[in-house]
Swiss-Prot record:
Domain of life: Bacteria
Stated name of the protein: 5'-nucleotidase SurE
Catalytic activity: a ribonucleoside 5'-phosphate + H2O = a ribonucleoside + phosphate
UniProt entry keywords in alphabetical sequence: Cytoplasm, Hydrolase, Metal-binding, Nucleotide-binding
Cofactor(s) in the UniProt record: a divalent metal cation
Length: 249
């Protein structure tokens, strides 16, 4: 088994070190990750400049690009052998509901969709690393179990782990994505020279976070697993759109 590990927190982040340590004796693991924090990069590719991989002392490969760049290069010649699966994380911070649209953690897993195995993205609901051992243990268990899993092609599992010691985790729930309320307005700032700028505000609170959602599961102490697919076609809208288009051209 060969696993490509990436993230969006950066190659020196504690989460990717914990994930690699958890998987290193299970599979042949290669780490390719951004050289700096690329949270919120989504599935962006770097197309305006060359990418320069650099192998660090610990064997991890640092790249001056996005999480998707990292996986794309890993699957297209940077590694001597093609990985069997992609595992992303462990992100310090939730990737729930609408977060998946912006998440570089989820995007890295999505870039592995062409492989035969199911890719996984792991996130811990904390900005602090205290419970990374919990997340790393759960990641190891799920990666081991993935070999017995048969899902449709191009499926990614988005895994969110409560910020709890392992003994307080109540179990695992399969969930759908919830939805967040609209984020607050960006914060306007002015630097000492009078130049204006803006900080993007934090994500909105859960607006659709009832039973069955990823929000609800983690708030109740359960690990949330949400299967994701790339196809965002809204099939239920076809009937209304057919009528709307009639006679336009």
């Amino acid at each position: 088994m060969r696993i490509l590990i990436s993230n969006d927190d950066g190659v020196t982040a504690p989460g990717i070190a914990a994930l690699h340590a958890a998987l290193a004796d299970y599979a042949e693991c290669a780490v390719i990750a951004p050289d700096q924090d690329k949270s919120g990069a989504s599935s962006s590719l770097t197309l305006d400049r060359p990418l320069h991989p650099q192998t660090l002392a610990n064997g991890f490969i640092s790249l001056n690009g996005t999480p998707t760049d990292c996986v794309h290069l890993g699957l297209n010649g940077l590694l001597p052998q093609m990985p069997d699966m992609v595992v992303s994380g462990i992100n310090l911070g939730a990737n729930l509901g609408d977060d998946v649209l912006y998440s570089g953690t989820v995007a890295a897993a999505l870039e592995g969709r062409f492989l035969g195995g199911t890719s996984l993205a792991f996130s811990l609901l904390s900005r602090q690393p205290d419970n990374l051992p919990t997340a790393a243990y759960i990641a190891r268990r799920l990666v081991e179990a993935q070999s017995r899993l048969v899902l449709p092609p191009r499926t990614v599992l988005n895994v969110n782990i409560p910020n709890l010691p392992l003994e307080h985790i109540r179990g695992i729930q399969l969930t759908r994505l919830g939805h967040r309320a609209r984020a607050a307005a960006p914060t306007k700032v002015v630097n000492p020279r009078g130049k204006e700028g803006y900080w993007i505000a934090v994500a909105g609170d859960a607006e659709d976070g009832g039973p069955g959602t990823d929000f609800h599961a983690v708030m109740q102490g359960y690990v949330s697993i949400t299967p994701l697919q790339l196809d965002r076609t809204f099939n239920d809208a076809f009937e209304q759109l057919d009528g709307w288009l009639e006679g336009l051209l």
